[in-house]
Amino acid sequence: MKLAWQEIKYYKFRYILIMLIILLLGIMVLFISGLAQGLARENISMLDNMKSEKYVLQDNKQPQIEKSIIKPEQQNKIEDITGQEPLKMAPQTLKIDKNEEDVLMINTVKNEKPELKAGHYPTKDNEVAINNKLTADGINVGDKIKLKDGKALKVSGVLNDTMYSHSSVVMMSDNGFNTLNKQASTIYPVKDLSKSEQEKVNDISGVKVFTENDITSEIPSYQAEQAPLNMMIVSLFVISAIVLSAFFYVMTIQKIPEIGILKAIGMKTKHLLSALIIQILITTMIGVIISVAIITGLSFLMPVSMPFHVTTSNLLLVVGVFIIVAIIGAILSFIKLFKVDPIEAIGGGE
């Protein structure tokens, strides 16, 4: 530890440079990761916020909830088996100032209400709870909003981060929803569904039980956005490994005479190796921790309309991957360190 720290202080400008590079790479990785998570939440947060593990939909080759039409006789059979109320959905358009906003309207379902950020859930037929992203347009609890057809609705509450396929969710009471939407898609979010109950539901003609992954994999925007963003993150980790590998390898070559002298006076290779690993960990941790602090600060400053989301688990994952990448990137330096011959390094072989 002492040798590693003394060397960092002696070559401080070189190590500051690599810390800055790691800092910039860390910021880019965390920002793109936060963007990927934010876009993902805009696609599936409505499902993530539910307590259900499975969903009953119309039996289609591609299980898309907006296309799930379940007939009344099928609904009666499903409700007899599951005891669950149906979740109904219909697209609507809000008029906000001079702009129009496409939203997904849902009814209120017992035990499956999205988390409320402010206000209360709608109880009257003319009340709605809106997704918090719509507050960026200046809408708050107590305000009135209009649908495209001119019908006015009062905002009773604000839902916390509830969206589906990039559309904000607007919740109404069951009676209010039925009055306003003559046609709607229907699904049944179910929790603790036993194997026998699932088999009974699947035996109902025209419906089937699906998992959340089955549904999210069929959202076109979800797959189209996540694949390139995840590829960018992987590419940045590869670039980080190459940069760190080149830096520490060059540093090792430049220190060959010093390494030779240390080996000649009896210092074991494992001590030199541990010093190198400590240097890698110190430089990587400092750069990554600062980048985490910067991104965390930015996440609080970004507007609610920005699709950006970071979690503690995601931040810890990135830190862990960076450390692994740094160690992998320094393998060439480890090999060079083992191969240094003390006599040749100090010129004794001439």
Curated annotation (Swiss-Prot):
Keywords, comma-separated and alphabetical: Cell membrane, Membrane, Transmembrane, Transmembrane helix, Transport
Domain of life of the organism encoding this protein: Bacteria
Subcellular location: Cell membrane
Alphabetical list of InterPro entries matching this protein: ABC-4/HrtB_transporter, ABC3_permease_C
Transmembrane feature ranges: 16-36, 233-253, 275-295, 315-335
Tagged with keyword NADP: no
Keyword Metal-binding set for record: no
Membrane topology per record: Multi-pass membrane protein
Family from the record: Belongs to the ABC-4 integral membrane protein family. HrtB subfamily.
Cited function: Part of the ABC transporter complex hrt involved in hemin import. Responsible for the translocation of the substrate across the membrane.
Complex formation: The complex is composed of two ATP-binding proteins (HrtA), two transmembrane proteins (HrtB) and a solute-binding protein.
Protein name, as recorded: Putative hemin transport system permease protein HrtB
Organism: Staphylococcus saprophyticus subsp. saprophyticus (strain ATCC 15305 / DSM 20229 / NCIMB 8711 / NCTC 7292 / S-41)
Gene, per the UniProt record: hrtB
